[in-house]
């Protein structure tokens, strides 16, 4: 792909609390800004939600995603018809052998404080919890078996294939689609977005971010802490990133340039 044909900005954004966060006016402002520059923006939804939710969302929103990463990074699709990306699916399938779910179930049955989420897809197992202490015991047992675990938003517990989360899947997706990392802005608000910030991609953590995420991103100078919530926080960073282009590493003290946009 020639540089002249490269998209100016790739926005890879979490949904709940981020792209869908804020009030109605803030969401409308973000969506209108993207719509006015639609040919310049590649929009990637990166969510813990599944494809059914995202298909409906794509029908309801005034802007639709070009690509989607769902189920905390364990499922990927491209285009309006949510077509699979063969190279990514092969990697995900290899990381999730047929007996993995059974192995997880054996451990989780010993921890009744973990309650299954009623609907989830992808290559994962997902649960609700109330108290973190007992869940940390289960997490230790599962990690010993070779799984990754993720606690977020003080209620969600995900068991994932080792090495598979939003961030790692996003990097593979960008590579598979020929999209440049240095033109990519990631956005999120909870701990299940941390792996996106850990990639080193330029990022924005919106103001309604989970306290645990705020603490976790402290060493990551690639992340801008927006003072705006949800969609307003995304727009706050997106306007600057889109205008200035490649400035990965430019952020100082977790702040994007304060240049008027």
Language-model features: where?
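Conserved acidic, metal-coordinating active-site core of Asp-based
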Residues: 103-199
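Generic enzyme active-site microenvironment
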Residues: 12-14, 69, 187
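Short, structured coil segments at secondary-structure junctions
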Residues: 61-64, 72, 145, 199-200, ...
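Active-site phosphate-binding/coordination module
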Residues: 24-116, 208
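Short, Lys/Arg-enriched N-terminal segments with co-localized hydrophobic residues
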Residues: 1-5
């Amino acid at each position: 792909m020639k540089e002249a044909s490269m998209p100016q900005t790739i926005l890879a954004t979490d949904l709940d609390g981020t792209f869908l966060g804020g009030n109605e006016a803030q969401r409308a402002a973000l969506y209108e800004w993207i719509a006015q520059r639609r040919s310049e923006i590649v929009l990637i939804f990166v969510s813990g939600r599944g494809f059914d939710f995202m298909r409906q969302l794509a029908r309801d929103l005034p802007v639709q995603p070009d690509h989607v990463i769902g189920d905390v990074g364990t499922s990927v699709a491209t285009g309006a018809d949510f077509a699979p990306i063969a190279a990514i699916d092969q990697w995900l399938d290899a990381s999730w052998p047929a007996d993995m779910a059974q192995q997880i179930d054996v451990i989780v049955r010993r921890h009744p404080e973990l309650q299954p989420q009623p609907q989830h897809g992808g290559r994962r197992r997902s649960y609700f919890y109330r108290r973190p202490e007992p869940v940390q015991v289960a997490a230790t047992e599962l990690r010993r078996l070779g799984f990754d675990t993720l606690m977020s938003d003080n209620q969600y517990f995900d068991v994932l294939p080792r090495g598979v989360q939003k961030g790692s899947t996003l990097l593979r997706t960008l590579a598979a689609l020929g999209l440049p990392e240095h033109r990519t802005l990631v956005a999120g608000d909870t701990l299940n977005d941390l792996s996106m910030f850990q990639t080193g991609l330029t990022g924005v953590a919106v103001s309604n971010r989970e306290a645990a995420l705020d603490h976790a991103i402290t060493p990551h100078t690639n992340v801008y802490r927006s003072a705006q919530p949800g969609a307003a926080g995304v727009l706050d960073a997106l306007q600057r990133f889109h205008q200035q282009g490649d400035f990965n590493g430019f952020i100082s003290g977790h702040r994007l340039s304060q240049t008027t946009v």
